[in-house]
Amino acid sequence: MIKKILGMFIPIITCITLSAQDYVMFQSQYLELRNGEHSALQAGVLKHNKKYHGGSNGPKAYLWYVHTGPNAGQYNWALGPVKFSHMDKALSAAHIKDWENNVSKYARSHGHTFMIRDENLTYNPQNEIVGENILVKRFKVKQGSPIHVQELEKAIGSIADVLRKTNAKIARRVYKTAFRQKVGELQLVYPFSSWERFEDGTQGLPADFWESYEKINGRGSQQKNVGDIIEKHSNGITNEVMTMVK
């Protein structure tokens, strides 16, 4: 129960250099305000994070404000990178009480999840640590057959392949749910430095990306390899633009 209270998302949203045995995982959750007290919640979360999740004696915690998507107006709190073994350590009574006083007093937590980064699908040339501003594209995987996630991964992988071949000046991290759920999910995380990134309409990818994609894969490949696959094997995409609260 307590571990669920302090569970988190995004994802996911931090990256480190991996060894062959290592993995990058984030535990996260959304925080929905109870009475619209933005400043109180922000101050409370930052206070709690500094005291218990500063990164010196364990994983670091981060807070983002969600600007777009189904959870717009809420916050996303993520801890990571974490290992499964971190969950073996019980939280102290003081830790739990501090969370209750500084966070759950102002917000309801929901959407707890563990997300693991897929290195084969990820393109992260600069090995960024944390994206202060990020676009999170969520793919809801259709259920009923493993072919749905396999085909989506193939489509997402074809994009990563072109990003590598063109030495793209962006990053795109891909995460998958660590535990099987009723509705599986793939998350594509694009860090950005300015909202101007969205003016060309590509929403994360380089402005000339699809031109390069079809040059490499053939005319009509964008629709065939990506568009049709997403339509057939997913239940839609949501786009969440988040900015870090510091």
Stretches found by the model and what they are:
Residues 20-246:
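Short S/T/G/P-rich N-terminal loop/turn motif that feeds into the first structured element of a domain
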Residues 1-24:
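Bacterial Sec-dependent N-terminal signal peptides
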